[in-house]
Amino acid sequence: MAYNRKETGEFGEKLAAEYLKGMGYSIIQTNCRLPEGEIDIVGQDGEYLVFIEVRTKRRLGYGLPAESVTPRKKAHLMASAESYIQKHRLEHFPCRIDFVSVDLSQPEPRLELIKNALGEE
């Protein structure tokens, strides 16, 4: 099991990618770095190009993983997604931002997918 913050995040992202594949997503890219920020996972779900933010927690004392996405982080996610779309000329694809919540507080990891987490497409 991962111990420090970076390792915990990387572990959660690997779990999330496998989880998403099992849900029918195709993984296009992971850890995509852009001037506006990082996109954890870029994938495709049917016709949708999907930008996925993975939130992993080992303890839930401060709330659920998805609750840790601040308004500032949401703004960075949207800006990063727009930058990715422009950089790769993908304006013709419908897009959305999903969250994957990874809870490592139990013996078995629990994952939850929140589709269209920001409510905009």
UniProtKB/Swiss-Prot annotation:
InterPro entries: Restrct_endonuc-II-like, tRNA_endonuc-like_dom_sf, UPF0102_YraN-like. Disulfide bonds: none annotated. One of its GO terms (molecular function) is nucleic acid binding. It comes from the Bacteria. Transmembrane segments: none annotated. Belongs to the UPF0102 family. This is UPF0102 protein DehaBAV1_0707. It comes from Dehalococcoides mccartyi (strain ATCC BAA-2100 / JCM 16839 / KCTC 5957 / BAV1). The lineage of its organism: Bacteria, Bacillati, Chloroflexota, Dehalococcoidia, Dehalococcoidales.
